[in-house]
Amino acid sequence: MKMLKKLLAVVLTGAMALTLLTACGGNAVTEKSIADAMTDMAKAQGAKATFTPRAEERELARKIAALREGKATDENSYDAIKKILDYDQGGVNENNFVWTDTVFTDELGTSGQAYEFINNNVLMLSRAWNGLDLFGKKAAKIHYMGTALYKGTDKKGNPVTVRVIVVTAKAEDPQQPGKA
């Protein structure tokens, strides 16, 4: 069984590399296809996470994309994003782990974008915006996600298309040994 898992991981990695090299661009990529690819990659890494697109996270991603496209300064951007994600005490996401990330979509297909999100530690609890606040908790298996696109610039000032992703997962108490 271990050998089969290793073989599956190698095949999936090869497929991702092939997709990265032959992708036709990121604008035709759907949230559902990214969610499916992220679920496959998480399973290949041994993580028990299923990514599911949801309107609430899509709206959060849309608001962040609008903020980023509006050329907000870094100092104001952090506080504005924190307010959008609403994870402080009494907030909508108070009891959810909340992750965000961005990726340049030009020349990246579904697997390429999903790989970037997974590779940037979207599964690490400590990388969640509120990971320290929820220390000692674990993320539920279902991870809800939403994405939005905006036009930005790379480090050289070239125009690029950027995808914002927002992922949430309910914070749960870890199961104690001997308890059901």
Provide a role label for each language-model segment.
Residues 2, 25, 103-104:
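N-terminal low-complexity, intrinsically disordered segments
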Residues 1-11:
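Bacterial Sec-dependent N-terminal signal peptides
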